[in-house]
């Protein structure tokens, strides 16, 4: 997957289109990501030993990875990610707009 935990992403479709947020977790088997402050759902819970009080809890739900786009830390624009190899053999993620290295994979 092109997106990793801690990346800043932009939502490009759906009810939260245009919102930015950090990736909280990545679910590669389902091809989904959880972004903080985006796709908030209300979950009804019963009282348990951990949570003495039941009620309605708001939490972020996963989004399909095709609905988010990585924001390059160098040019601060949403971009696609290319994977290239350096001379020493390391694989890195590269911004397709400004050609800067985002980080190593």
From Swiss-Prot:
Question: Which SUPFAM superfamilies does the entry link to?
Answer: Translation proteins SH3-like domain (SSF50104)
Query: Coiled coil located at which positions?
Result: none
Q: Which GO terms describe its cellular component?
A: cytosolic large ribosomal subunit
What GO biological process terms are annotated to this protein in UniProt? Answer: translation
Query: In the record, what terms sit under GO molecular function?
Result: rRNA binding; structural constituent of ribosome
| This protein's UniProt keywords | Ribonucleoprotein, Ribosomal protein, RNA-binding, rRNA-binding
Gene3D superfamilies on file: 2.30.30.30
Disulphide bonds in the chain: none
> Which InterPro entries does the protein's record reference?
KOW, Rib_uL2_dom2, Ribosomal_uL24, Ribosomal_uL24_CS, Ribosomal_uL24_KOW, Translation_prot_SH3-like_sf
- How is this protein organized at the quaternary level? Part of the 50S ribosomal subunit.
Q: Which family does it belong to?
A: Belongs to the universal ribosomal protein uL24 family.
What does this protein do, in the record's words? Answer: One of two assembly initiator proteins, it binds directly to the 5'-end of the 23S rRNA, where it nucleates assembly of the 50S subunit. One of the proteins that surrounds the polypeptide exit tunnel on the outside of the subunit.
Under the heading NCBIfam families, the entry gives: rplX_bact
Task: Extract the PANTHER family matched here.
Answer: MITOCHONDRIAL RIBOSOMAL PROTEIN L24
The name under which this protein is listed is Large ribosomal subunit protein uL24
Q: Which organism is it from?
A: Dictyoglomus turgidum (strain DSM 6724 / Z-1310)
């Amino acid at each position: 997957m092109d997106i990793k935990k801690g990346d800043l992403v932009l939502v490009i479709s759906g009810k939260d289109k245009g919102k930015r947020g950090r990736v909280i977790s990545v679910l590669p088997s389902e091809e989904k990501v959880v972004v903080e402050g985006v796709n908030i759902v209300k979950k009804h819970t019963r009282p348990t030993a951990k949570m003495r009080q039941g009620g309605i809890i708001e939490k972020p739900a996963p989004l399909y990875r095709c609905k988010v786009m990585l924001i390059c830390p160098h040019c601060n624009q949403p971009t696609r990610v290319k994977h290239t190899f350096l001379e020493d053999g390391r694989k890195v993620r590269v911004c397709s707009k400004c050609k800067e290295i985002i980080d190593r994979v």
